[in-house]
């Protein structure tokens, strides 16, 4: 019994010594200054927010780059964004044979602006009133590398 008690006491001392030895290196904590993101605006050409435009104007805007700036007109770089093209397509009811209009959505994620040539061509071939071009989840970076969301940009063709 004496042997077991001595063995347990020795193990306890050994565990205590190793646990206290690990506490000597303390981790350094870095504190960051709070950052209040400025109010950003997303523009394409001279348009921002939700705008009604003609298909001809939309065609000319497709080749332009998205611009992100704050209220003081400081430019920000685009980290990424999503683009959605909601187009009008015809569908046929198989039972009645009647053709009706509905919408189809094409969307993708991009990291550079303007849109790639392939996407510009896909959108340009069918631009009609009632369709939508939507830039959303626009993420901008400032000069210090901080990321922030910029407002969405939506074009409705009429």
Roles of regions detected by a PLM:
Residues 1-26:
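Bacterial Sec-dependent N-terminal signal peptides
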Residues 27-84:
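Contiguous beta-strand segments within globular domains
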Residues 11-13, 75, 147:
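A generic structural signal for short, solvent-exposed coil/turn residues
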Residues 14, 52-58, 115-116, 150:
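General structural signal for secondary-structure boundaries
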Residues 74, 78-100:
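Contiguous segments within soluble domain cores/interaction surfaces
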Residues 25-38, 145-158:
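Short beta-strand elements
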Residues 6, 11, 47, 71, ...:
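Generic structural motif
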Residues 91, 95-157:
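Mature extracytoplasmic or organellar-lumen-exposed domains after removal of signal/transit peptides
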């Amino acid at each position: 019994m004496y042997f077991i008690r001595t063995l347990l006491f020795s193990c306890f001392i050994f565990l205590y010594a190793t646990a206290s030895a690990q506490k000597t290196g303390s981790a350094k904590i870095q504190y960051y200054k709070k950052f209040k993101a400025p109010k950003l605006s997303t523009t394409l050409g001279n348009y921002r927010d939700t705008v009604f435009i003609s298909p001809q104007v939309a065609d000319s805007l497709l080749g332009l780059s998205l611009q992100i700036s704050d209220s003081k007109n400081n430019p920000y770089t685009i980290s990424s964004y999503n683009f959605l093209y909601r187009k009008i397509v015809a569908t046929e009811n198989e039972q009645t044979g009647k053709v009706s209009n509905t919408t189809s959505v094409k969307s993708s994620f991009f990291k550079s602006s303007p849109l790639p040539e392939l996407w510009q061509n896909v959108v340009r071939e069918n631009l009609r009133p009632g369709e939508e071009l939507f830039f959303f989840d626009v993420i901008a970076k400032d000069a210090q590398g901080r990321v922030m969301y910029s407002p969405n940009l939506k074009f409705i063709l009429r």
